[in-house]
């Protein structure tokens, strides 16, 4: 989430 805002 925090590093990869894909969801």
Swiss-Prot record:
<protein>
    <recommendedName>
        <fullName>Uncharacterized protein IMPP3</fullName>
    </recommendedName>
</protein>
């Amino acid at each position: 989430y925090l590093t990869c805002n894909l969801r």
